Amino acid sequence: MNLGDMYNSGFEFALTGHLVNRNDFKWDMTLQASTFKNEITSLPDPFINGSKRWVEGRSRFDFFLLRTAGVDPETGDQLFLLYEQNEDGESVPVIDETTGEIATTNDWEETERAYTGDSSIPDLLGSVSNSFSYK
């Protein structure tokens, strides 16, 4: 059963060169590169799948995680940036009124996950392969 729609795009490029082409020895090299983009275009309701949140307008490969703020130097506890959900269900930072920075907490259950701005899709994927033959 399909729950939604997504749009995928990208390109793939390959270039092969015959570097040495003699009767008894041949050497070929191939360079390959590709890109890939993904966007969810239709989905009835957003949902979380592991470290990803699937929602219209985002990629299904965007990381949706608890944001860390390092370690509390006084206690050694891990600190998390404090986020809350707005009325649209989006994670927004909670601003500390005294510092003007995003508030922190050492209790991961007090915060919400947020998009990190990172994706599990690399910007560019590539490879180099060589082929040698003798006689």
PLM features: residue spans?
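C-terminal extensions
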Residues: M1-N2, K135
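Conserved small-residue
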Residues: N2-Y7, F11, H18-S120
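Residues on the lipid-exposed face of transmembrane beta-strands in outer-membrane beta-barrel proteins
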Residues: F13-G17, V128-Y134
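Residue-level marker for the onset of beta-strands and adjacent loop->beta junctions
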Residues: I40, G126-V128
